[in-house]
């Protein structure tokens, strides 16, 4: 073909190639049509008559087909005037002129958007479209048709250059159901001014496009703002970008997610007549009939009707206006791998592809954390894969009043981490507290927030929604509630993003503050799932560095290494949260024993020895692991007890309530006990608040008196009489745990319980330091007075001296209550020389610790047990004596019987043997008579000798038989047939006389 000359080319305004273009596979024919002819840049009439491109012809054919289709529908349906007036869709379709020509708008870089405020303008401007087209072509820089996949571009240097893929509601996107939808680029300041001018003067002939609001300003936008969201998820984010205006005629079913069929969502859009939305269209159209048939059929009348649900509502709601058509520049459908994105758009493709040009970037959209969950649920319920197409319908509608009420009511139920405190914590029925609760009625404090009221409110709001949604089914209304419940978190997205997830608050219910120390706070908590009680340590200050973290983690390492022991506080879990370390441990319901000192609760010697025995058992286990505690003191020794009904202290002829052991509940279980002198049968449990102050005061006086004179083997805790044998003492607070062979100590313990060698940095005997600390603890409990932190008394304790003379009257009274063996035991434990101090194993073998203080009852019990042992031994001796007598009688009978063996061939040998046997028997009898005390041993020896003799006799007998056999053999050879009979007397044991054949 003939290409135009250089002079002719000046008439044509060619497209400047910049980085903002998107090219296809054949860039050489971008400036040519199907006939390889250069596209002329004249007005639209000239281009129509001379050089019409293939796509322009297709557009005109499609519009004609659509017009014919509409005329057929009007003739078949013939709606009334009232129906037409009530339907904005019919009005728009009837008033639109057959403008099937794409045109350029003057000074516009984006494609018109048909929103809620543009429907009226569409009808007014339809008559002026042709005039605008003819007048503006001369001013436009690009009036030729492009075949390649390029975006709209303006070469004007005065305005910013960007791809103008806008959201269009006026284009015929129902014919291109598979065209990906692109988002418009951010509007410049110049475009925003044009938008304001357009809103002020709507009667001008210049049709300007309102630019969309960026994503960052969506929350502050007006009713014309656009929601930039993917198509499959715009209903999920409806409440996130919810506007303030309320339309009573709007359907809440826009927010529905139908679990059974995704097509119900599209049907809801067809029923929504007043939902005027900003529709997002693609600026690219198909280039061939094959690409138009997205549903697998060729371009015909049937294919136009077979449109997807997302595009079908464009014709029904009147947003499709034939007057607002594309500009004269040809646009093509962008493939999924060539999709263009601007700065405020993001891809929903599972495998994102690179952008078509270097200047177009895909920003990482920071979606909320719950977005993938809702997306996945919606896709799983509909059994559909995530679509790679961007044909999205962004919902910019305002919810009605009923929907807003639902949001407010549901926000009270689901506030994320803020509502954790209202969750119900279970009570384990297998624990002691659970058993007590099964007997008693639940306490009012356990009746936490009930969600029935909120559910009723939700049902009432659901009824309101049914009244407002006249065009929807009841099933869709049920979906409203489910979707609203899912979107409540999106309504409070700011609070959820600010409030961090707390494992401590989510897993445990905080009940009380147990204690506070240098480490931090210790809380009594209940696990929300298993219902058990735990003690959780939390660092007081946030960890500032690795050094602080290492110091705190030493206790965690120690607890995890020790695992589980009866006399050591059990460790469960540890975690770090907000620069705080949390340690979950076993809850000890009796607290620590330091309150014995502060409250002057005196303990007997037997109780302290029982305490020392259990603590030494735990120390032995720690030392067996090659570790040392280095912080043994009353504050770190805890009590676990079990309270039974028989252990409750009561007063005669009084009726009062006493607190049972509460394993960490908010309030103790109350019980009324009516007692007599010998009766505790009438036990009535109640949960009402008790106001028996007078009875409690009288009872407390008795408790104090019993505690101050606690010489018996029991302990009074919370009004309960606890037997010391049922109490378990545990070692806790392993923050200073260290290796026994380590010469470096990170921190020292309490100076009141430190040994002298540790004060002088002597780390050679760290195990003996624990013994010194335990000795100081027993000394403090015996005195019932706190140890000094400095002074002469402090120094005397380091020297192993107990200064009895300098003590006050309280200590003098305690001195007489303990034995000298007890004080000697304490002195040995606090000896200044660590090599002299006994080890933990040796102390467990000490008689005073092993057996404790023996009382009169213990002596009587011991005597009874000894008598029983003696009686059993006497019975055994009598039986043995009777057996010995029977054996002696049998032997005498055997000796009295004659034991002669007559052998004619060897008479002399037999006589000698008989004499020897007779002599041995006589000797045996003489020895037996002389040694009556050793009858058993001598009898055994005589039996052994007798057996030896019998064996010798048997051997001789065998030899004799062999000789006889030889003689018989010789006699047979000599043919001498005679027999000799030899009669011999057998021994007394063999059973008498035997005849032998020779």
From Swiss-Prot:
Q: Which reaction does it catalyse?
A: L-seryl-[protein] + ATP = O-phospho-L-seryl-[protein] + ADP + H(+); L-threonyl-[protein] + ATP = O-phospho-L-threonyl-[protein] + ADP + H(+)
Composition-biased stretches, type Polar residues, lie in: 166-177, 316-328
Low complexity bias: where? Answer: 70-139, 184-203, 265-274, 393-415, 450-489
Q: Which residues bind Mg(2+)?
A: 636, 677
- Tell me which residues bind ATP: 514-522, 537
User: Region (Disordered): which ranges?
Assistant: 1-34, 65-207, 265-284, 316-367, 380-420, 435-489
Entry keyword annotation includes Acetylation: no
Q: Where is the composition biased (Basic and acidic residues)?
A: 330-340
The UniProt regions of compositional bias labelled Acidic residues, in chain numbering, are 23-32
- In Gene Ontology terms, what is one molecular function of this protein? protein serine/threonine kinase activity
Query: What are the protein's UniProt keywords?
Result: ATP-binding, Kinase, Magnesium, Metal-binding, Nucleotide-binding, Serine/threonine-protein kinase, Transferase
Q: Give the SMART domains listed for this entry.
A: S_TKc
The Protein kinase domain covers which part of the protein?
Answer: 508-849
- In terms of domain of life, where is this protein from? Eukaryota
Per the record, where are the segments of Basic residues compositional bias?
140-150
Report what the protein is called: Probable protein kinase DDB_G0277539
Q: Which organism is it from?
A: Dictyostelium discoideum
